[in-house]
Amino acid sequence: MKKTKNKDNSWYDISKRGDTMNCFFNALFMFINNPEVRDLNYRIALGLLENGHELDYLTINELAERCFVSTSSLNRFFRIYGYKKYMIFKALFSSHLRIRYVQIQNRMNDKDYEMLHKVFSSILKSEDYERLIDMSWVKEVCEMIHNSKRIILIGSDEMASFFSRMQTDFYVMGKLVIKDSIYKTNFFTPEKDDCVILLSMEGRIVDLNSWLLDKMKENNPKMITIGHYDYLQDAYGLTIPQGLDEVFENMILDYYIQKITYYYAEKYL
């Protein structure tokens, strides 16, 4: 049983807050995945995730400055989720990152793609199947991600929801994944050192927002598209063949996400 001391020298059992920390991480990503509402909670969640790997070295005043909020606002945010002492919160946060990293390793060791490959070979054309299982694409995509500061997701809420586990996994591996708005009033322009993943599928998101492609490319970030069409000639395209049942489309999307996550963990950690 792992314990730490409170300021009054009483002992506090860290393991009791494991479930609470899971809920806390879910809340942080919920706030940054709702880019239409950039309120106090959004600023705290984003600032905390941007600086989470440095928490051991930050005082609460320094963290508040980086979140662009007051110390009292930050303390109030922590108390809502049951954390009354910043030192205890920091210990739990760091411990949670280590636990999630071990979980990634366990999932990698237990994963067997043989059955999934059989399903893909039965529903896809031979050229689509060979392209899907060819590992060259995942190497190039992971290299693009590795050489970027952040991953920016642009797409519908429905498609972006598939990336929820990847978002947490990559955060544990030191890479922040942020969902951008698809509306001009709240869209933030990706920076040159970002890697943008455009979830285009049938392309309606592009057809309905004629300004989107130009704004995405404005600072010349690295770009990856996932969907039926490659809207950007200078982007790396991961194709999901047309004419498939929605279940199979989702299976291929999830396959892309898993391969990217596990190869990145194996290659760069």
Where are these predicted regions, by residue range?
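Glycine-rich phosphate-binding loops that contact phosphosugars or nucleotide phosphates
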Residues: H146-L269
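Key DNA-contact positions within bacterial/archaeal DNA-binding proteins
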Residues: S72
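Glycine-rich phosphate/diphosphate-binding loops that line cofactor/substrate pockets in enzymes
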Residues: S136-K149
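N-terminal intrinsically disordered/low-complexity leader segments
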Residues: M1-P35
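HTH-adjacent hinge/linker in prokaryotic transcriptional regulators
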Residues: C23-F24, E36-L40, L46, E50-Y57, ...
